[in-house]
Amino acid sequence: MGLLEFFNRQHLKGRESDSNLRARVKSFETAAGMQTAGPEAFDLSKESESTHKLYGLKRGDTKSFGWQCMVGRRLIERGVRFVELIDGDTRIDYNWDAHANMTNYDRLARNVDHPIAGLLKDLKDRGMMEDTLVVFATEFGRGPFQPTPGVNGRGHHSRVYSSWIAGAGVKGGMVHGQSDELGDNVAKDLVTVHDFQSTILHLLGIDHERLTYRHAGRNFRLTDVHGNVVKQILA
């Protein structure tokens, strides 16, 4: 690695203004750093039994959501700025794609509930919640009605569903928004996807109105022209 770094630095001489080249060198350095630091971050053998229990995790388990949560905390401790955890699988008996069957939702929810609660407690106990934002979300909900008689499933439902945020800059222990009595439409305090994104960006210290990309001679906002920060949930 030292030899590669030497050649990269030699190649950069006289080309310091080439941002693409500097970024290329930086990407190689980042990749090398992941290879050297990654194995230690993913090694849970030194975590205590009580911590494993907190996440509902058995030693040696590398597939569960609890494993993802504990690794996520370890990555954040080591300076990783963005971590994504995903629950679900492609197996027909373990995924959230409930078009034909929702009877496994209780089991799916239990498998997520224990680890995510453990993660929040662990972050708080370690003093990490003050500068960590936890966003628990999905791409859409499930409708309140059976679209096909006799089939215990639900279709995609984008009109109303829930997400939650915890951590830095967010009020705790509150609910914002309300559905109608059937869970079919929003009845109060609508939060659009653009509002949700705007609020997350605000909590990350980013002005969503200035975060733009250039296309066809115009500047476009990632939150479009509709996004507004949901100030009611801010601490």
Functional labels for PLM-detected ranges:
Residues 1-235:
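Ligand-binding pockets and gating/stacking loops
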